[in-house]
Design a protein with these regions (language model features):
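Acidic donor-binding segment of Leloir-type glycosyltransferases
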Residues: 1-37
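Glycine-rich, basic loop-to-helix element that forms the pyrophosphate-binding segment
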Residues: 38-55
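Short aromatic/hydrophobic "clamp" motif used to bind/position activated sugar donors
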Residues: 60
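Conserved donor NDP-sugar-binding/catalytic core segment of glycosyltransferases
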Residues: 68-101
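A recurrent flexible, glycine/aromatic-enriched loop bordering the glycosyltransferase active site
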Residues: 110-127, 142-144
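Acidic donor-binding loop at a coil-to-helix junction in glycosyltransferase catalytic cores
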Residues: 144-151
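Active-site donor/metal-binding and catalytic loop motifs
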Residues: 163-195
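Non-catalytic, C-terminal membrane-associated alpha-helical segments of glycosyltransferases
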Residues: 186-189, 203-262
């Protein structure tokens, strides 16, 4: 048998659904588990920092609410591979037969880009509490999106390792395609707002900079301005195109830049 001393701390970021609040509070009835209720929505970055502040252990494992460990020895893998000078990222995968129905666009995007995990993703990572406290999440990221990208960059800039190991979770994301598209735009809003910080690590921003330098770079605004409805019809359908999704993202980014530069 494998025995460890651990606690589970859950953050409820001002849920408005009373059924969810009730279910979350039942966590307090479980041994070594507790839930913290925020009076207002403070955002992902502040949430993670607060969880780290109240946690009692020497190591921290961060998991999003919509993930589930793939392996039965999930915790053991992290403990056996722990490092004192960095963070372990276990990665993610997706399943079509999970407890929630994934939208075609969300599943397609996740399998194409997120499973490969080209950069730090915060839904499943493990690190010493001391390392976290020296870096912490940048709380200027109050909106959805890219706070994890910046945290990963801050870790590396501080000299810490970001190591990937094979210890995935199922990401049972229940967003509809429409919700995912809305989140995409919100994340791009955040990307543009923090463009000076994120330019070194964001491929989308780097691509924009290259196109913007060209005489015909302004043409990339046209797809979102002229064909937004057609593109969204494809993205919300049963057979979405990732090519159209990427054009949608880039074109929206170009339009947002135009707004910020006015």
């Amino acid at each position: 048998a494998y025995s460890i001393e651990a606690e589970v701390v859950v953050m409820d970021d001002a849920s408005t659904d009373l059924d969810i609040v009730k279910r979350n509070r039942s966590i307090n009835d479980l041994e070594f588990c507790r839930v913290i209720e925020s009076e207002e929505n403070i955002g992902i970055a502040k949430n993670r920092n607060h969880l780290a502040d109240v946690a009692k252990g020497d190591y921290l494992l961060f998991l999003d609410a919509d993930v589930y460990p793939v392996s039965l020895d999930f915790l053991k893998k992290y403990i056996d591979n722990r490092v004192d000078d960095g963070v372990l990222c276990g990665g993610m995968t997706f399943r079509l037969d999970g407890p929630v129905k994934m939208s075609p666009l969300r599943y397609l995007y996740g399998m194409k880009y997120e499973v490969k995990q080209p950069q730090f993703i915060s839904l499943n990572f493990f690190l010493p509490a001391s390392v976290f406290q020296k870096v912490r999440f940048n709380e200027s990221f109050s909106k959805y999106g890219h706070e994890d990208t910046q945290f990963g960059a801050d870790l590396q800039n501080a000299g810490y390792k970001v190591l990937k190991i094979d210890n995935p979770v199922y990401h049972d994301n229940g967003d509809t395609s429409e919700q995912f598209v809305i989140k995409t735009r919100v994340a791009i809003d955040n990307l543009v707002e923090h463009r000076d910080l994120l330019l070194p690590t964001s491929r989308l921003l780097q691509l924009y900079e290259k196109l913007h330098a060209l005489p015909i770079g302004w043409l990339m605004k046209i797809p979102f301005k002229k064909f937004r409805q057609r593109m969204e019809k494809n993205l919300l359908g049963d057979s979405p195109s990732l090519f159209i999704y990427n054009v949608y993202r880039l074109s929206y980014l170009c339009c947002k830049y135009e707004e910020y530069e006015r």
